[in-house]
Design a protein with these regions (language model features):
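Histidine-/acidic-rich catalytic cores in large beta-rich domains
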Residues: 1-494
Length: 494
């Protein structure tokens, strides 16, 4: 495989500013990979798949043992499992649906995809004093079901279902997004498009319309909004997002109703216009109590393409009508809908440069953002297997690029998590060696010229350069309608 040459492994590490620990990531065709801050691989659970993988106290790992044949399905994991440090299965759930695909033995499957949460921790990453249970407790799982619902489409649909199971594997609660179609706020144009083409995938079991594609699901946990009396934010309520629909919402667990939502149309209110259109987002969750920014909504706004609406020159069938060629991290106050923090590649860049620089942080698919105890944010730019940690002031203090390997060429990282060292008592704390940032202006690989300018010839009639260089678009043509001088974060659209 040919690719541009760039360093892999850990490329930046400032131990004084980073929140150090182990980073867990799922690597396709390899398994669950645990690294230290210098990129040393300290553990690989071979072939233990992660959609995503999560680390539990005591060196336990969660993920799945297999995946359904994709000729008959779309992104169905066979189960959700918990293994110990030595790879022994200590818990597994698969008895949701008996699958009988042609040419395969009948098999019970969970049809899990994209997310799950173990009781004790609302989000699955490290939160002080909120540890996932390892020998008991319920597990909330995001699953698929194949359905027909003619209120949505006359096509076969791949529906998203939240399933809560106890330690013994009994299903104790379920919620289906298709049963709340009228609550989702689709325009009539979007409904017409959905009926004709609900984002169809073709399998040997027929067409599957992945109409919502929910890719994140977590409980809210204890939070200040509920403490102040806002029932929408009950700790048991579930926050989720749907990438195909550009929707982020909270489901009331007791009633099943959707009680909070932004999207799909970000022109609907003044507050949403200031946020700007969110497209194809991932990992929308509430920052848990005990972490900086607690109570705010954190998400990876991918950009790329998503959404349903009127057909146009870019989308002749009305699917994937919203397009943007860069990504953003957004932290949003869920009550005021104000963006209180954001990250793009062009932060602190002015003039024409944001349009150019922004594309250097861009993952059209997958990806995530985790708030760390010191206020930093761990970002997974999944399509390019880049994981990096930024401070509140947008300084990159740790960066890692997963190396390409023969086992997993062109890999991506769905979602990475940072955990404290004491989650793995089987290992001694590793040495933390600073990795200085390369000076990219002067760095050269062996054999390359030093890059110094030389051999000048003066052109007597040349008049030199003006102070400003013209580009194809001028900065006064940039749409900055999302900018508000009273906002803490301005120009969030870019």
């Amino acid at each position: 495989m040919s690719s541009t040459i760039y360093p892999t492994g850990t490329t930046i590490y400032n131990p004084e500013k980073a929140w150090s620990g182990y980073t867990l990531m799922p690597i396709p065709k390899i398994g669950a990979v645990l690294i230290d801050m210098n990129g040393n691989v300290v553990k690989v659970w071979k072939d233990f798949q992660g959609f995503p993988n999560k680390l539990l106290p005591g060196g336990y790992c969660m993920g799945s043992l297999g995946v359904r044949d994709n000729e008959y399905s779309y992104q169905d994991q066979t189960d959700v499992a918990q293994i110990d440090w030595d790879g022994n299965v200590v818990w597994k759930f698969n008895k949701k649906e008996l699958i009988e695909d042609e040419g395969h033995e009948p098999e019970w499957m969970a049809r899990q995809h994209h997310d799950y949460q173990r009781e004790g921790n609302p989000v699955g990453y490290y939160v002080p004093d909120m540890e996932c249970k390892t020998d008991s407790g319920n597990t909330l799982i995001l699953c698929h079901e194949t359905i027909h619902n003619h209120k949505i489409s006359d096509k076969q649909l791949l529906d998203d279902v939240f399933v809560e199971v106890d330690w013994e594997g009994n299903i104790v609660w379920e919620w289906r997004v298709s049963e709340h179609f009228r609550e989702l706020g689709f325009s009539q144009a979007a409904k017409n498009v959905l009926f004709r083409n609900p984002n169809q995938h073709f399998t040997k079991n027929g067409e599957l319309g992945d109409w919502m594609h929910i890719n994140s699901m977590s409980t809210l946990g204890p939070n200040k909004w509920y403490d102040q009396g806002d029932e929408r934010f009950h700790p048991d309520n579930i926050i989720w997002d749907a990438r195909e629909a550009n929707i982020m919402a909270i489901t009331d667990k007791k009633s099943g109703k959707i009680v909070w939502q932004i999207g799909p149309d970000f022109t609907a209110t003044k507050e949403m216009r200031k946020i700007g259109q969110i497209i194809g987002q991932h990992h929308c969750h509430m920052i848990p109590k005990g972490l900086p920014g607690e109570g705010n909504i954190l998400l990876f706004d991918n950009g790329g393409w998503a959404g349903y609406g009127l057909p146009d020159r870019m989308s002749t069938d009305g699917t994937k009508v919203d397009i943007r060629d860069h990504s953003r991290i957004l932290e949003i106050n869920p009550v005021t809908l104000k963006v209180v923090w954001s990250y793009t590649a062009s932060d602190n860049v002015t003039g024409m440069m944001p349009i150019i620089v922004n594309t250097t942080f861009y993952s059209q698919l997958i990806s995530s953002a985790q708030r760390l105890p010191n206020g930093n944010t761990l970002i997974t730019e999944g399509c390019f297997s880049r994981i990096f940690e930024v401070t509140k002031d947008k300084e990159i203090v740790w960066e890692y690029r997963a190396p390409f390997t023969k086992e997993s060429p062109g890999q991506f990282v769905y979602r990475a998590y940072r955990y404290p060292y004491d989650y793995v008592p089987q290992l001694d704390k590793p040495e933390e060696v600073p990795v200085e940032r390369l000076e990219v202006e002067t760095f050269r690989v062996p054999g390359a010229a030093p890059g110094m300018l030389d051999h000048f010839t003066t052109v007597p009639e040349a008049k030199g350069y003006t102070s400003n260089l013209d580009a194809c678009v001028t900065d006064d043509q940039i749409d900055d309608s999302s900018t508000d001088p009273d906002d803490e974060v301005t120009g969030a659209k870019f």
